[in-house]
Every structure is written in C-alpha cells, then in structure tokens.
Amino acid sequence: MQKLLFVFSVLLTVVLATAPFQVQCPSSPLIREAKHELCPEETLYLKKKKIKTKNKLIQFLKSLTEAKFSSKFYKRVLKDPPKIGIAISGGGYRSMLVGTGFISQMNDYGLFEYSDYIAGLSGGSWILMDLVVQNFEVKSLLQEWDLEEDLLLGIPEFDISEEEIVTNAKKEYNDNDLKMKKRQGGSLITSSSNFYEQIEEIMNSIEEIPEDYMITKRNLNPLARLKKIFFPNNTFTGTDAKIETFKKVLDFYKSLHLKIKPKKMEGFQISFTDYWGKAIVQRLKKNFDDDPNHSFSFSKLVNSSKKFKECSVPIPIFVANCKNGLLSNVIFEFTPFEFGSWENILRLFVKLPYLGSKIVSGKAEKCINNFDDLGFITATSSSIFNNVLIFIWNLASQSSREAMKALNMVMGIFGLGKEEIFSISKDSSRLETDYAVYQPNPFYLYPEKDNVLTNKNHLYLVDGGEDGENIPLRTLVIPERELDVIFVLDSSSDIDNYPNGSKLKRIFEKLDEENVHYQFPNNVKTFTHPIVIGCNATKRTGHDSFLPIIIYHANANHGNASNTSTFKITYNQSEVSSMLPTGRGVFSNDYDLYYKNCLGCILTKRTMDRLPRKKKFSPFCLQCFKDYCYS
C-alpha cells in the first residue's frame, strides 16, 4: 500500500507541472473586440512571414516548365504575393493519414511553408497537434504516434459514419421517465455475480429503450451494438483472460484520471473531453504529460517553436462548434494568439495564454496560464469520440464490485462518479460534462453583448464537424484574412467512407446566408480530381477584396483504398504506408505534370486579377482555367 501511495505521489507531482496555474494579470486588456481587423500578433506574424517565404512561391513557379512564366510576371508576384490557406476536414485517423500525405506533397512542392494558415477540425486537428509537437517539420509527422496501440484501450473497431453519429443530436428529451430509465440502466448492479453477466444485463437494459427516443450523439446508441462485437455468440469463454484484459483497460483509464486530477484540484470543471485529450496525447510515443519540465500549452509550444519564431510556417487554427443554448453552426477558433469567434453574435477574442482566466465584463479578475492544453484543444475539436468514452465509462463502472468501487472512487473526485452520471439532477445550473466545458467563460457579461454566449459563465464546445460542417473553411474565408486561395482536403465519410461533396455544399449554403456566394458544382458526378471553385474575380459583398479561390480535393482511391472507418483506432505499418500515398495523389492529381503547371496559374490568379489591365493571362493559363475551373 505504501509503495502504491509513493507511485501515486510521484505521478501526481509530474502531472501537476502541466496543470493550469495562477499568474499576475497584465495591465493591457485580455479581450479584443474584432471589428474589421486581425489581432496585432497575427498581423505582425503574417507581415514577417511574407518577407520570409515569398521566394518559395517563386521557386515553385520557376520549376514549372510548361507554364513558362516571364521575369516580369515573377516581379508582379513578388510585389503582390498571393495568400494561401489549407483546410483539413474531419475523419479520424483516415483524415490524419490522408492529410499527412497531402501536406507532405505540398511540402515537396515548397507550398506548405509558403501557406499562411492551416485549419483543422476533428481528425484534421490531429495533424495540427502533430505539426506543433514536431516543430512544424512535415517530414517528421507521424514519427511520435503509436498507431498500432488502440487509441481508446478496450474499445473494438467499428464502422459508423460521422453522419450517423450526429443525425439526431438536436433532439431533446421530453419523457423524463424514459430518460430516468436510460440513465439508470444497470446502474444498481453491484453484486459480485458473474462479471460478464452484469455487462450483458447492462447492454440489455440499454437496448430496451425505443429506437425513436435515442439520441445518437449523446447516449449509448449506436454504441450498444458493440455488444455483438464484444460477445458475438452471447457466450463468455476465457473469463480469466478477459478479466485480465479488463484490468489493463481499467489501468489505462485510471491513468487518464490521474492526469486530469490536477486541473480539477485547481477548481476547473472536468468534462469527458479532458479524458479524451489525455487519451490522444497518450498515443504519442513521447508522453509529454510525464515530463515535469515540459508544458503542453498550445501557445507556449507554438511560440517556442524555432520555425514559428522565424515566421516560416503557416498559422495553425483549431476549429470547434459552440452548443450554448440552441446554437448550431456557430464556430470558435483557437490560434496560437487568441481564442474566440468571428460570428456576428460575438466577434470577441481572448489572448490564448490567458484562456481559463476569470474575466467579467471584459475585466480580468484572476489570471490563469496553461489552461490552453494542446491535448484538450485537440480533443475539443474532435469530440465526436466522446460518445465512445461515454460507452467505456458505462461499461467499466458497472463491472464487478471491486472494479466499480475503484473506478467510482476516482471518478467521484472529479464529480463524474456513478451517482453523477446515472442520476437526473434537478439543479439546472449543473454543467453538461459530455461537452467540452470552458469555464470561466472569458466573454461573460461582456458589455453590449447580451446573448447565450455571454450570459452564462461557461461555453460548451464540441467537435467542429458535429453540425455537419466537417471542413474548417469558414474560418479561412473571413475577409479579415484576405486569402486568395484555399486548398481544401475533404476526408468525410458520406458514401462508403468517401466524401461526395455534401459537406462542402452545406458550408456554401451557410456562407450564402452571410452574403458570401460560391456555386457548388452540381454537374460533377465524382470527386476524384481537384475542382477549382470561384475562379471568376468576384468581389465580396461590402468589401473591396476578391473572394478566395477554393481548390477542392476529395479523398478517393488513388491506387489504394482509403475509405477506412472514422472509428478505426489502430493502423499497422502496412496500412499507414498505403494511406500516405493516397494523400499525395489527391494533392498532385496523381502527379499530373500538366495540373502542377496549371497550379501555378491558379495560385497567382488573384494577383493578376488585382492588376488594372484586362489582358493579364497567358494562353496556357487561360486553357488551365478552362480545364479546371468550375463556373
């Protein structure tokens, strides 16, 4: 027992080093009202980056032997270089692996470091975390990931589309009796009878709930079907081995609890997303949580990166959705500089290092650092996996009396014990911990902003793709960023785990409501090649700048099938080796030399559009626009 307490004490000392802590508040305001400008730090970074990387584009253009650009053309581009963004969709490891190949090919062309922004959500956000961990060295991506170990220990692989997960997410519970039954399903099982019989009883109680009443995102359906995977024949053979496996699973989740505890001890609300964040970080071979001298703060990691300090890499942007009230498709973003939203309902930002501070009416009362944990932010953007964690907690906490007591004791410390999870609270102020909880809300009671984002002292954030907006495009399209071209990689699972363009269409419909008009290519049957949208020099409504050109790339079979399930949580080396070339093929159009040359025309089109003279493009570029631009 003493040895166990000693180990616990040592581990707790280590993880406390990464917990949020109080600091002295700065004299300058922490909240910025976003009127029509970027924050000063972002503006300065882009100004320095333009000087640092503009020659990379010239090098790429000079490598294009068919386009034959002139020296006069190069001078124009150097004088007014295009601004480029990258948007990586969700899709679990599928998105991360295809996306890694995608930006690796960009890097080979010299276009990755030239780009100004890279935005990711859900599985795409894992690429951003990897980039930050690897000091933005594209060639080092995936080296720290242990892809052969289960991402969530104890959960088998299954194939459910993101669309199926979020289909009924907006439904509300109206039947309290049914709700009570759902939450109490199996929760009173505490006897020491056969362990697997208890699990079976729990699963049966879950399946008794009428299908029409189930909320797929926020309860155990469709995860109840995993019973068939755990127990395909309804038989429980090899009990000793299974109990040993379960102990391993339990140890895994206990370790997550231990790493989350310091945040709770500092008085912060804990949610399932905290555990999910630690689970993601544990899949890194170098466990940063075990290094007492290493902060995993997003702002600190990025701003200590050599390449980022040199202003030679794109700014990473994590995207999440807000669920306060009945909001939908209200997006928030995390950059290394600030956190907030460009949505008209808010347009406020807080300096990222001070996220977690108590700020009321725009004035700082207690300042915190280290709340911006990179794992937590990544998990927030990819919290569609929360339902998997909910499943494992229900499975584990209803096991044998000994295991249940051990787990319930640890969970109770965080306010996530059996009683809290399975009971109906009459306290309306109680927070929904299956969302990512950001409390204190930095925008609480902000003057002249009385709405659901400011009248509560918490923000609920969820997977960036939960409302069907699975591509982080809108955060890049805003006029303040003045982008000319956006590379989009869509690895959504619309049909057979391949995208069909529906996510892009949904975003265009949302943009249309904001007077930002793109025409969706309805006459395109398949999305196996890049499609260039918005080539025509269309100016924004109410602005003097042009809308950015969107180069849409869809994950497709480029010699290797890449339609693995979003919830496939292990990949062996052979599988990884087959996915990465797909991403390269998607970006390069299967290494098509003509397309590569045309890319030079497309990337510089807005630069030429801004020239006053009408005759601007070479015959070669005009043919490229005809071949690839959708109008």
UniProtKB/Swiss-Prot annotation:
The record's account of how the chain is modified after translation: Glycosylated.
Transmembrane intervals: 376-396
Enzyme category, top tier: hydrolase
A Pfam family reported for this protein in Swiss-Prot or TrEMBL: PLA2_B
Protein EC: 3.1.1.-
Keyword terms of this UniProt record: Endoplasmic reticulum, Glycoprotein, Hydrolase, Lipid degradation, Lipid metabolism, Meiosis, Membrane, Nucleus, Signal, Sporulation, Transmembrane, Transmembrane helix
Signal is among the record's keywords: yes
Molecular function GO labels: phospholipase A2 activity; phospholipase activity
Induction details: Induced early in sporulation. Not detected during vegetative growth.
Locations listed in the record: Endoplasmic reticulum membrane; Nucleus membrane
Designated name of the protein: Putative meiotic phospholipase SPO1
Organism: Saccharomyces cerevisiae (strain ATCC 204508 / S288c)
